[in-house]
């Protein structure tokens, strides 16, 4: 059963490699891709059920026992993230079938799509820091290709910033890996948790912790290192933007939550207070960017920034309720954000623009599109009874219980500004007078909406099934707040 752990990585990697051989056969690529991504989702669900029933699953590659060999570790948090990545992978791929041009398909869109999923799943499942770096690079190299597909001037200019900032982050990552190896002699996360706990060099460990925080903050889009994100995510087609918006920043957030609950928990008075400050600044400046925009995709891009602030807010508060709220919020945000980017793509196909001032009246001509967007928008803003409300409520309640009143006030204010900016999209794009042509009004949007329906349905389910989902989030929080569970499973102590 342990071999199941590698399948969410192996399936997309093998499929991506295989699809390179059929670069000119687009129809065949679509068929293979469709079956493969659904298969990956089914395997991910099976793995998650197994871990939930039987506990943490560890795969020692080559039968080299940890901490000496490479290990893959599937716990509740990792398997949840793998399932979410697979869901977004399925939906975005089927949306791409409708929207990606043959020009982009012939330049290896499908192979690199799967390589990116392999990197994402690998980052969630790896049990050591060096292979976390390796999977980050697999993911990022694939994203470099996907972000420039089409080769427009805007894409190339903005993707250069994306590449430069991530190359710098990768260099800093290696520096951090070398630094922590030099004082502990290991890179296995479970072994690091043990050895860091035995060290009395708090100052040195804090420096290393800050290095890793900067690295993951660059990749996760935290203040003040988010400047690359809004314009980089504006250029690619909607399917790619949705994949990036739903997943890529969450890999950075996952890495922060994993390392700062397992390894760098030696001085929470310093590290987690710093994280809490960054969370507040990220939320505030991200939502200000969203409020100031009048472009559909740019508003959504800035909201990625503001919303990751909520996720690390839970880590900064560092209580069971706060971590559970953050876990719930991550699941909510991945689903909702992917849906919203796909809605942006659908409206762009109808109107030919993402400029809100050039839109209007879509509610009359495309009511299903309008109301499905509305559900996702108010969920993002945190309106009950949808998923955004319950996750934000848990985070804000945790802040009040922990007497973190300032961050609670920031979270409430950001929620109101999020609602304002999302209603601005709804009013400009869907309300008012029709500004598109008769041909655009008659555009058949059904095929585009079909892949988005599961995401909207999940958004509703995550809200109406809040009780069992929050109980699961509490279980995840209990597991990651008790490092001994992870350590004993990996090191078999």
From Swiss-Prot:
GO terms for biological process: ATP synthesis coupled electron transport; sodium ion transport. It is found in: Cell membrane. GO terms for molecular function: antiporter activity; NADH dehydrogenase (ubiquinone) activity. Pfam families: Proton_antipo_M (PF00361). Keywords: Antiport, Cell membrane, Hydrogen ion transport, Ion transport, Membrane, Sodium, Sodium transport, Transmembrane, Transmembrane helix, Transport. It comes from the Bacteria. InterPro entries: CPA3_Na-H_Antiporter_D, NADH_UbQ_OxRdtase, ND/Mrp_TM. Mrp-dependent antiport apparently occurs by a secondary, proton motive force-dependent mechanism, but the similarity of several Mrp proteins to membrane-embedded subunits of energy-coupled NADH dehydrogenase complexes raises the possibility that there is a capacity for electron transport that could provide a primary energy coupling option for Mrp functions. This is Na(+)/H(+) antiporter subunit D. It comes from Alkalihalophilus pseudofirmus (strain ATCC BAA-2126 / JCM 17055 / OF4) (Bacillus pseudofirmus).
